[in-house]
Design a protein with these regions (language model features):
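Active-site region of the double-stranded beta-helix
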Residues: 5-9, 17-18, 22-148
Length: 149
């Protein structure tokens, strides 16, 4: 908050690029999202279940958000952050990272049914926070997108 570079050492675009281009990621380790359309994993996952790097790059250029699930498994700085937070909160902590192209939106309005700590390390985003739509949502509970815009 008002310290743009405070968390810049946690993860960079170059780190994400190195993970995507340098590792043989499988479906589930990387996903794509685009608020403007539904994306199928068939668009960026090959028949063996591996991520098609060229397709990921093309979809990113067209506005898709790159999601690295469990990114702390690939990034020592994120692993250290998770271990520190686990020590502080006595709870399991994991990281998912999101790289969204400028002027794009990865997700439509939604809520998470688990606790989330957001750390934005680069760029700008207008965040909209709403009152709790449901006091204690449970996994799989429906969300009415038109109700929260």
């Amino acid at each position: 908050h008002n310290e743009p570079g405070r968390f810049s050492g946690l993860l960079t675009i170059d780190d994400v690029d190195s993970i995507v281009t340098g590792l043989d990621l499988k479906q589930g380790q990387l996903a794509l999202a685009d608020a403007s359309r539904d994306l199928s994993a068939d668009e960026y996952v090959d028949a063996a279940g591996f991520i098609d790097r060229g397709a990921v790059a093309d979809l990113y250029r067209r506005g898709a958000t790159i999601i690295l699930n469990q990114a702390h498994q690939f990034t020592p700085s994120l692993a250290r952050l998770c271990r520190g937070l686990e020590h502080t909160f006595s709870s399991h902590v994991q990281t998912n990272t999101y790289l969204t192209p400028p002027s794009a939106q990865g997700f439509r309005t939604h809520y998470d049914n688990h606790d989330v700590l957001v750390i934005q390390v680069e760029g700008e985003k207008a965040w909209r926070l709403y009152e709790k739509p449901i006091d204690t949502p449970y996994r799989g509970e429906g969300f009415e997108p038109g109700k929260y815009q």
